[in-house]
Amino acid sequence: KIYMKKIHVGFLLSYDYIKLKNSIPPVYKMADKIFIAVDHEFRTWAGQKFEVEATFFNWLKEIDKDHKIEIYKDNFYIPTLNAIQNDTRERHLLSLKMGIGNWLIQIDSDEYIPDFKGFVNQLKKYNHYLDNPKENPIQIAGFHVDIYKYLDDGLLYVKNTCKVLLATNYPNYKLARQSYERVI
């Protein structure tokens, strides 16, 4: 089987969708494809309905000059599952849609990778893990800084960083983005 070894980035669209206007542009140029998962009835993991203004979808079309963005609609709310189980399920289905054999990067709407080009260049050093992902599942982590408050002249942030799981070669998620596989 020939693997594509592409950079596929996935986002989950929900009630905080407007934040995607900040998180999509930094990854657009380096991503081979961008997938945006949204419940087909616009429901959260807890089953609450939300609305998305048409102007947001217009904005997506405007910025998608290279036709990289795909909206993936599916039933992501199962009433017999709790919110974290629905979260995990949506991430898994999104990753399957993104295609095993590619780097599967999932970024939450309130997360930004300031040097996405550097992240991708580092990620490509591990492309050999895409040759047989089921036998060699890994997750790629980065560090994230929690922004406390935006100010007119900057921002306040929490000094201590923590690890965040951003990419995988094989999406066997157990809890949100966590698969409990080897982390690099």
What are these regions (language model features)?
Residues K1-K29, I36:
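N-proximal low-complexity "stem/linker" segments adjacent to membrane-targeting elements
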